[in-house]
Amino acid sequence: MSDPFDPTENAPGPAGLHAAGLHAVESVSDTAPLGLEVSAALVGEYRWIEHALYRLLGQWVTEMPIAAVQVHLDAQSMRHAWHAELFADRLPVMAGADPDVWTAPSAPTTALFAALSGSTPPTTGSAPIAPSGDEDVFEHPGALPRLAALHRVVLPRLVTTYELHLQLASPMTDAPVARALRLVLNDEVEDWQAGERMVERLVSRPHDVAAVYQFLQRLEAVVVGAGATSGLVAIPGPVPGD
């Protein structure tokens, strides 16, 4: 049986229901409500992201040298596990369709988690998503750069995604998803702020600043190069401020 959380089985591509749903996301008009397949593709990717964060942060707990950071990441990891369950419960049930089919990452999500996991981000066609010469940065990210990436790239982009989705959710048809988004957003913002305070305390030397911003710059380049704009997951509708 396939594992919906295995990146090797859910690499982004033009085929499959998830890709069809994301294509529908891109083609929805500014005022149209989210359709069933669009909503399923979004919620399925949220589930994938939250489960991936649960597993990744659980791994990082044993690699962080400071006890306070370990405690923070352990608690945050458990919240991400709960978020994944919330989104799993809100995947639509359609005749003849396995809800796990929707649990798949898009290209920006795949690239982001490859870099955070210490792997060289995947290629798009014949060209790598990562800028040339960045392989060592992604193969050996330090504890502090990873902590900063979580709270200065991942959570801010995830919060933006959830907020944009919430703005477009219909109070009639999307009430269960909107409720889950509000619950998850509350946790994400709290973890983001607590993590940012921690990063600011730990970045205490010029070397720390250089290491953090080198990793953040390359990580943002990877995510943007994979197609991300506002947030991490593509949401239909106009972006405020554009």
Which role does the model predict for each range below?
Residues 2-241:
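Non-heme di-metal
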